[in-house]
Amino acid sequence: MSRILDNEQMMDEEMVERTLRPQYLQEYIGQDKVKNQLKIFIEAAKLRDEALDHALLFGPPGLGKTTMAFVIANELGVNIKQTSGPVIEKAGDLVAILNDLEPGDVLFIDEIHRLPMAVEEVLYSAMEDFYIDIMIGSGDANRSVHLDLPPFTLIGATTRAGMLSNPLRARFGITGHMEYYEEADLTEIVERTAEIFEMDITHEAAKELALRSRGTPRIANRLLKRVRDYAQIMGNGLIDETITDQALSMLDVDHEGLDYVDQKILRTMIEMYGGGPVGLGTLSVNIAEERETVEDMYEPYLIQKGFIMRTRTGRVATRKAYEHLGYEYMEK
C-alpha cells in the first residue's frame, strides 16, 4: 500500500486541490506572515503600475506554494503560466516560454532548484533587465540575437532553497518561507474542505484530524477522504472523533501525526544505532528510502516536532522519540 502521508501528488489529488484552491489572499487560511507581506508588496506594485518583484516561495511539500502563486496572480489581475524545473531541459525551452509572456504576467516555476545550469543562466538577464541574448545558427552562421521581454514576475517554488545558486537566489526581491500550519488553521482548512464536499464532520473530529496531519493541508485533505470512506463503511457517515481515531489508527497514523515510515526511522535509530548519531545516508539505506526523500519529506517534521536532532556527526533521536515509542531513555 502506498504511504498515506506521502506528499507526491497524484492526478486526482491535483483536481481536488484545484477545487479547494482559494482565489485571493483573504480566502487563504494560514501563512499570515507571508500573506501580510505579499499584500503590501502587491498593492504597492499595482499603485505604481509595475510588475511585482520576483518571488521565491520555499518550505516543505504540501504547504500551499503553488496555491499562493495562483493567488498572487489573481491579486495582481494578470495571467499565470505554470511549469517546473525538470520539464525545462534546455535553454530553448525557457526562451519559448519567456517569449510568450504578456506585460505583467506571472511565470511560476515549481521545483526551481532542479533547473539545469544552462537554463538558469538564461534567467539572469531575463529577471534583472527583462531581456535575453540567444545564439542561433551554427558554425560560421552562428550569431547572437537580442530579445527584449515585457516586465513579468517570476515566482519560484522549492522544497530545497539551499540548492539554489547564489546568483539565482539574489535575483528574487521577495522571499516567502512557508511554514507548517498551526492546529487551529489546519482545523479550519479541514472544515472548509468538508463543507465543499458536503461531508458531515464534527468540530472535534476536524481538530483531531488536523492534529495528526503533520501541519500540512495536503495531508489533511488526503486523510479526510480516507476517514470519510471509513465513516461510510464502518459507521453511519458521520465523521466524529471516535471514527476519526479508528480510521487514522487503521492507517498507522498516530496521535503525533507519525506514520509507519516515521516510526521506522526512529526505531532504526534507537534499536540499531543506540539513538545515534547516524548519518543520513546510512539511515536511508536501512529503511530502504532514497536519501532525498528522507531529507525532504520525513526529517523536517521529525525535527520540528522534537523527535530527532541534527548534529555535526549525524542524526540523533531525542528523549521524546524514546518515550513516544515506549523505549527507556538513558542519558549519554
From Swiss-Prot:
The gene is ruvB. It comes from Streptococcus gordonii (strain Challis / ATCC 35105 / BCRC 15272 / CH1 / DL1 / V288). ATP binds at L20, R21, G62, K65, T66, T67, E128, D129, F130, R171, Y181, R218. This is Holliday junction branch migration complex subunit RuvB. Mg(2+) binds at T66. Its EC number is 3.6.4.-. GO terms for molecular function: ATP binding; ATP hydrolysis activity; four-way junction DNA binding; four-way junction helicase activity. Homohexamer. Forms an RuvA(8)-RuvB(12)-Holliday junction (HJ) complex. HJ DNA is sandwiched between 2 RuvA tetramers; dsDNA enters through RuvA and exits via RuvB. An RuvB hexamer assembles on each DNA strand where it exits the tetramer. Each RuvB hexamer is contacted by two RuvA subunits (via domain III) on 2 adjacent RuvB subunits; this complex drives branch migration. In the full resolvosome a probable DNA-RuvA(4)-RuvB(12)-RuvC(2) complex forms which resolves the HJ. It is an enzyme of class 3 (hydrolase). Has 3 domains, the large (RuvB-L) and small ATPase (RuvB-S) domains and the C-terminal head (RuvB-H) domain. The head domain binds DNA, while the ATPase domains jointly bind ATP, ADP or are empty depending on the state of the subunit in the translocation cycle. During a single DNA translocation step the structure of each domain remains the same, but their relative positions change. HAMAP family: DNA_HJ_migration_RuvB. Residues 255-332 are annotated as: Head domain (RuvB-H). Residues 1-181 are annotated as: Large ATPase domain (RuvB-L).
